[in-house]
């Protein structure tokens, strides 16, 4: 099992219920693939450093995860094709 930090930005024009549904959906993707989410940090809505997909703001979420690479790869694959996530990054934490 490896430790990962996942940061993703949700598009700002979603209401609270829709945003929570996106967060729950992607948390469940990780859990269904055997990942353990150790920490969830909601940074809230922040201004982006530059425009991404015509958005100037985004809702930031940061997850700390312990999992096999398979779970993170599935998260990455689905985050790439989701219209609700405008940017994401997965970083493997050093030992």
UniProtKB/Swiss-Prot annotation:
GO terms for cellular component: cytoplasm; ribonucleoprotein complex; ribosome. SUPFAM superfamilies: Ribosomal protein S6 (SSF54995). The gene is rpsF. Disulfide bonds: none annotated. GO terms for biological process: translation. The keyword Ribonucleoprotein applies. Belongs to the bacterial ribosomal protein bS6 family. Keywords: Ribonucleoprotein, Ribosomal protein, RNA-binding, rRNA-binding. This is Small ribosomal subunit protein bS6. Gene3D superfamilies: 3.30.70.60. The keyword Plastid does not apply. GO terms for molecular function: small ribosomal subunit rRNA binding; structural constituent of ribosome. InterPro entries: Ribosomal_bS6, Ribosomal_bS6_CS, Ribosomal_bS6_sf, Ribosomal_S6_plastid/chlpt, Transl_elong_EF1B/ribsomal_bS6. CDD domains: bS6. Binds together with bS18 to 16S ribosomal RNA.
